[in-house]
């Protein structure tokens, strides 16, 4: 609890200048709520469940995506590349990649982003623009972990065939015995663990 209070999102529900931390702290808060629930600490559960939904504080309805806010709550100026700008409030990713990280409230994320059809179209577009070798890129960047859950979002959108299509394509083209056969740093086993789970 002390660590969450010290390093988590501020009282306004976000980490200044940072989309990555804001979304990841929200997920941490959701996990804390589940622990509190298991321990029978209803007050703590309610507190952390509420904090876990603060991802909406950094969603900009005007641009239609997540943007970093400064200490005063003002959105940072959009860069020329918009949500494709690596480092714009994100760690080793861009807002387009990082913005899908609301695993604890996918339905809420879908509503916030404009509904099922809009989200489905956006996800399809992301994968269709991804290079076939899955090396480092601005779209579905399998070379780095922030997007590893994204192909599975099609399941939550009622399109499991697209999860199957893209996970099979990734398994086939991002993992092989050539020079580019492992598209990213193994990072404590995440790349191979993803393959084992997705190929099953």
Residue positions per predicted region:
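Active-site core of glycosidic bond-cleaving carbohydrate-active enzymes
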Residues: 1-200
């Amino acid at each position: 609890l002390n660590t969450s209070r010290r390093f988590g999102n501020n009282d306004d529900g976000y980490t200044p200048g940072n989309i990555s931390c804001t979304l990841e702290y929200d997920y941490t808060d959701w996990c804390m709520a589940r622990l509190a629930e298991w321990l029978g600490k209803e007050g703590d559960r309610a507190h952390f469940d509420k904090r876990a939904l603060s991802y909406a504080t950094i969603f900009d309805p005007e641009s239609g995506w997540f943007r970093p806010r400064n200490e005063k709550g003002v959105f940072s100026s959009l860069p020329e590349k918009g949500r494709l700008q690596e480092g714009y409030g994100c760690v080793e990713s861009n807002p387009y990649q990082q913005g899908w990280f609301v695993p604890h409230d996918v339905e809420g994320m879908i509503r916030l982003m404009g509904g099922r059809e809009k989200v489905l179209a956006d996800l399809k577009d992301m994968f269709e623009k991804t290079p076939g070798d899955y090396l480092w890129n601005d779209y579905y960047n399998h070379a780095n972990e922030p997007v590893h859950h994204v192909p599975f979002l099609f399941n939550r959108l009622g399109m499991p065939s697209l999860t199957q299509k893209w996970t099979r394509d990734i398994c086939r083209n991002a993992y092989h015995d050539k020079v580019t056969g492992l598209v990213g740093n193994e990072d404590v086993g995440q790349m191979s663990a993803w393959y084992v789970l997705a190929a099953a």
